[in-house]
């Protein structure tokens, strides 16, 4: 009989309870005990959902107070030495300082978890890293679950993935040299699990789905030769891509089973079936853990029948990956179109899908009604008139190659823009958003509840825009933004104004820490019925004589940060988005806006995990960006913004986007990203972020000037812009004004220094 489990479950809570408890703790409004209590309640609730779905295992260890990689660093005793914290006595307050920074130290670096929109904190390792052990929250959670008589399956990120995703803080240090010590620590952790009577442990190794060098693969084999004989059965979990080429290697290791992502990489199944020994468990990840569409249970059931006949009780049915990447439950969705809602499955519903498949394998008659209901929903979706728009189909068919090209090359555009815009050396600007104050959030909530008239809401937003404009003028910024007071989210705001999009009331997923996003759903062809930002941007420009920058979200990011329809290629949906954004760019230019930013923070996130698959993605991703941007005159300056990214391996494609200015996240990595831009001789203008907006720490003007001087060593000052790392939506006004004051001072001081050619430095 097939068994059931999931790799992980969302931790934030159906009503974002963890987020609100975290932020209350950070503000000093509640203590650690309150936060611990909320976390305990959430874990128990999520375990009970798995029990209620009749899963054979309850997953424990997927919870984190901020991030699972940070949790693992704390458990291993591998905290950044620069903080001086003792991992064994780590408090939640200090745990959060690692994630958010403090007065003495900036936060740990944060970057994307593989090709998802989740962010993890990058471990900082070096020769002095000992893995002596740390705070054992994991075992507290296991004990909680055991006390509830639950069938516990702990989950940990595996040692190879942990090292692969870490960074060395010592130049030239080979972090793989730490593996022997790390394996010893993992072995001790597994021994503690054995002492608690744990039968199975899930060790996540998604790094096996990227292009690992051979020395890392050999290290993987050596590690699991040890860990597989710990006395606890190891389920080696891979996800997000195929790991088929490693099947022969894994087959000779003493691991008791493997988990495969058969949604993203169904083609790998045959290799694993051929390689796995007769005793090994195959965990089939057949329910999509990264998208919200109801599964075709009938088709999946048919495919599982042959596997079940072959593997019997060694077949486990599961989701493709952790359900962290989808909302918790459809129960709270009262306003979704009924037909659309019937096409969806969130995390809780996916538990039911996993259980239904196992039931169908055991007793087809018992699952017949549920399978039939799924078939009816899928059939209704296939034939719905809301999915296809003839106008969009006609326009997509008419797209030409010329639509992706600006009128002139960058050098000519740059000359014309310098004449038209009249900006100083090292122009200062921000990335777009300003603090979303309680007053802004309350007004938006009241408007959405129908308690505030549209005209009153418009007046309040215009008042906030004027505040943002006046503050920027006082700060001395060169290029202003309207502050995005009216925008709840950089994707949702636009999606709400496009056909083919739908929105949930409570479809939150965790992006990082307490930051949650509510991705819209692209269910049909995308079309812009009317301008989206023109009136707001025109109003903001009317308040000032300075340049006002229009702010849009790019087609790739709209795609990546939405739940995307799965009935046509993603590239087709991206092209539809590009055409909608192109129309908005043209309308902004007609309204007198001479600088327009098309944000693409998720551009790199869309890269396939395997380098061999990159070229096809980069071709269509750069094309749709260019189509979105190329409808304007040469004198109109197009900016783009990217954050949390490593660009060096895709710089030709970044250059091919042909944005006049790119702003990037660099402050946490001490401008190291710029080295690649310099070596590549990136031709266009660039704004390296000079301070980290994710930390409440305000760097002084001297520190920012040093970063700018470092940037000038790589990029000519004539092509540099000065800006923060990212938008300022999540920050408060006092720290925002303090940081921007220092940023402007740093830019002015460096301008003067470059003009005078003397080494005077600003004072803090």
UniProtKB/Swiss-Prot annotation:
Pathway: Amino-acid biosynthesis; L-methionine biosynthesis via de novo pathway; L-methionine from L-homocysteine (MetE route): step 1/1. Binds 1 zinc ion per subunit. It is an enzyme of class 2 (transferase). Transmembrane segments: none annotated. InterPro entries: Cbl-indep_Met_Synth_N, Cobalamin-indep_Met_synthase, Met_Synth_C/arc, UROD/MetE-like_sf. It catalyses: 5-methyltetrahydropteroyltri-L-glutamate + L-homocysteine = tetrahydropteroyltri-L-glutamate + L-methionine. The active site is at 694 (proton donor). L-methionine binds at residues 431-433, 484, 599. Its EC number is 2.1.1.14. Catalyzes the transfer of a methyl group from 5-methyltetrahydrofolate to homocysteine resulting in methionine formation. This is 5-methyltetrahydropteroyltriglutamate--homocysteine methyltransferase.
